[in-house]
């Protein structure tokens, strides 16, 4: 049986760990509220922009754009949005496994498959397994639209220079604190979602022209999709970390209970042994 001193030391250690996990849970909860507000604000804008692009792309007097041009099977780029920090349950492991699954199931469709990682954890997992086109790390602490726009512009430049022919975006979409859905979207070429036909579709007047507006909105659409994916990932990360730290705190409390019981039993056994020794000594003196 472990000594009283070692058991007490373990109890103190687990209590300190529980204090840390509880603090991390509270911090994640505060960050999650802000991140969730950002996601909720970004979703309607991204959806409405997609609807405008869908209407423009169906117009007969618009020839399209190089960003919508489909090329015959070639080089593909997969963007994986992970996190810079750990202690968030299976958040990073799940997204990396999804990237591995994409490479295994669809890699044969392309002449070459490269990966771009956003977040240190994804890069560390994938760097020795796949060709990493580029890595962005330590950007989530000060995440803003300008950062996402910069990445999107670099992707657009690479696509127009034919460095790759298709771009896919893999990220955790935020559903709730307990649920994050791994989502795969095609970023390039842009393929607007086809909405259901309306009985009465209003005819809009576009200025200066539909073609000019399409050329202006397509890069903006890619920027917005990138920014939204990163916001979704940040909210998912905080939700996953909050859940993981809550679970860790509960496990620590259970362990403290078991160790305390073990400590009390050991202490009781030690006291009983001491009493038996005293009684035995007393009996021997009397005898």
From Swiss-Prot:
The taxonomic lineage of its organism, from the top, reads: Bacteria, Pseudomonadati, Thermodesulfobacteriota, Desulfuromonadia, Geobacterales
Q: Which family does it belong to?
A: Belongs to the ATPase gamma chain family.
Q: What does this protein do?
A: Produces ATP from ADP in the presence of a proton gradient across the membrane. The gamma chain is believed to be important in regulating ATPase activity and the flow of protons through the CF(0) complex.
> What is an annotated GO biological process for this record, any one?
proton motive force-driven plasma membrane ATP synthesis
The answer on whether this UniProt entry bears the keyword Transmembrane reads no
Protein name, as recorded:
ATP synthase gamma chain
Assembly description: F-type ATPases have 2 components, CF(1) - the catalytic core - and CF(0) - the membrane proton channel. CF(1) has five subunits: alpha(3), beta(3), gamma(1), delta(1), epsilon(1). CF(0) has three main subunits: a, b and c.
Stated membrane topology is: Peripheral membrane protein
Its predominant location is membrane
Q: Where in the cell is it found?
A: Cell inner membrane
Keyword vocabulary terms for this entry: ATP synthesis, Cell inner membrane, Cell membrane, CF(1), Hydrogen ion transport, Ion transport, Membrane, Transport
**Which InterPro entries is this protein grouped with?**
ATP_synth_F1_ATPase_gsu, ATP_synth_F1_gsu
Q: Which GO terms describe its molecular function?
A: ATP binding; proton-transporting ATP synthase activity, rotational mechanism
The terms describing its cellular component in GO are: plasma membrane; proton-transporting ATP synthase complex
* Superkingdom classification of source: Bacteria
| Disulfide partners | none
The answer to whether keyword Transport applies is yes
List the Pfam families.
ATP-synt
